[in-house]
């Protein structure tokens, strides 16, 4: 075993039986902590007839009530303000505030103690070290430091490893690119959308990232593109760098990441318990190859614990063990979408990630696209807006044919295809909402 490959060689290579014992022990501890310190959790578990002494096995864990975003929204704004009675520590122990982006509704407030934030940084350090970050790396963060968790932990994890961290802050995209060139930055963290957008901007100002910049490692998060092969390929070719996916959320923390093998997402099973639940039956999925929604427990967050949080991201286990030697299990294909993003169009279940895979696999199209679903009478009508790269403008007819055929093959649907002028569709630095469902809501 090459110990230099692991941030924590002991935990990352722990035999399965020992790892499961550790998870059961940590679940009991966080369950007990929440039961004894949070009115919200005490009532939730009391109503279910459960108390700490009942947790003796993984089967017992599966009986513990799940929590959802809607439950957290309901208690926000109440005492202790603004977090509500999910809080497990006195307000004076809260040192950090973050909130979700609100893309699925009212933002969720997240409280952390200093120790909680140290845990978040440690969890991210596992990811960056696995991706080859080392002392001597000069890491650029082209992100606005704000109330969203975004790449805050990337910054502090990089420092913890010994990297030099350069905050891009309020600089615009062009200035960020020039600063990366000036300082010879070797690594970067951003959303997939912004990674592609920065490469586009760089070319406009005469900079070719693979040859004119020294970025050789890119960590992406915030969107599913890092585990979509066509999108990853575009990013790697645009920058001449390895691109690694990293996943997490404000409420949970940074629970999964790719290592240098790029064989799938490792789940940090020393810090988190990840369960996969069948969307239709509610039963557990333990075997590889079957997709379900993710339920996560964070072991090391004391202020506002997340215990059996129904994330609704769709994942499935990979049957293979990674060649890196870690015993943390792999997910096959990363985040495959969200259970609440999958929508029925013309009677067909449609995942937005399937459309992204098709668009990004056609090199004559730009990185940007937009999908719009409306009602025409009683019929669903779906339009895909794309941009052709200028040098291929004369090939619009053949590109349309390929696009229509691939969309039909991958999604079983027909689309109205609209070609727009290159650069005219919206660009974003953060999470992009490219799927717009404008059909009337049924009540």
Residue locations for each model-derived region?
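AMP-binding/adenylate-forming
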Residues: 114-127, 138-197
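Adenylate-forming
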Residues: 195-214, 233-236
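Nucleotide 5′-phosphate-binding alpha/beta core
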Residues: 1-99, 105-122, 126-130, 378-385, ...
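AMP-binding/adenylate-forming catalytic core of the ANL superfamily
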Residues: 188, 295, 299-413, 430
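Conserved AMP-binding/adenylate-forming
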Residues: 220, 225-227, 231-321
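Conserved helix-loop-beta element of the AMP-binding
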Residues: 138, 205-226
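Short helix-loop-beta connector
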Residues: 133-137
């Amino acid at each position: 075993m090459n110990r230099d490959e692991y941030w924590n060689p002991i935990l990352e290579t722990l035999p399965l039986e020992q790892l499961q014992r550790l998870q059961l022990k940590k679940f009991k501890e966080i369950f007990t902590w929440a039961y004894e310190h949070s009115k919200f959790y005490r009532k939730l578990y009391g109503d279910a007839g459960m108390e700490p002494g009942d947790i003796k096995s993984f089967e017992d864990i599966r009986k513990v009530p799940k929590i959802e975003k809607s439950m957290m929204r309901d208690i926000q704004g109440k005492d202790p303000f603004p977090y509500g009675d999910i809080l497990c520590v006195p307000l004076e122990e809260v040192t950090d505030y973050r909130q979700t982006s609100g893309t699925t509704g009212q933002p969720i407030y997240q409280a952390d103690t200093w120790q909680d934030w140290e845990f978040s940084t440690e969890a991210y350090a596992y990811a960056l070290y696995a991706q080859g970050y080392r002392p001597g790396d000069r890491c650029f963060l082209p992100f606005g430091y704000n109330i969203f968790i975004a790449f805050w932990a990337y910054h502090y994890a990089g420092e913890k490893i010994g990297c030099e961290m350069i905050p891009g802050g309020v600089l615009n995209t062009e200035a960020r690119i020039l600063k990366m060139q000036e300082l010879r930055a070797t690594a970067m963290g951003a959303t997939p959308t912004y990674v592609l957008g920065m490469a586009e901007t760089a070319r406009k100002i005469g900079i070719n990232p693979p040859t004119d910049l020294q970025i050789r490692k890119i960590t992406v998060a915030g969107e599913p593109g890092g585990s979509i092969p066509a999108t990853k390929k575009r990013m790697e070719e645009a920058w001449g760098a390895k691109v690694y996916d990293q996943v997490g959320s404000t409420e949970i923390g940074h629970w999964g990441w790719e290592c240098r093998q790029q064989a799938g997402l490792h789940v940090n099973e020393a810090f988190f318990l990840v369960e996969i639940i069948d969307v239709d039956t509610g039963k557990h999925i333990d075997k590889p190859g079957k997709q379900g929604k993710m339920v996560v427990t964070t072991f090391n967050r004391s202020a506002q614990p997340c215990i059996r949080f129904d994330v609704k991201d769709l994942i499935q286990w990979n049957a293979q063990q990674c060649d890196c030697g870690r015993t943390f299990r792999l997910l096959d294909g990363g985040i495959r979408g969200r259970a609440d993003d999958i929508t029925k169009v013309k009677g067909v279940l449609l995942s937005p990630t399937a459309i992204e895979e098709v668009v990004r696999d056609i090199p004559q199209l730009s990185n940007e696209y937009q999908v719009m679903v409306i009602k025409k009478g009683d019929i669903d009508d779906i339009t895909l807006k794309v941009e052709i790269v200028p040098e291929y403008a004369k090939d619009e007819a053949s590109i349309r044919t390929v696009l229509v055929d691939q969309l039909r093959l991958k999604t079983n649907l027909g689309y109205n295809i609209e070609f727009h002028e290159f650069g005219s569709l919206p660009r974003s630095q953060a999470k992009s909402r490219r799927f717009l469902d404008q059909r009337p809501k049924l009540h």
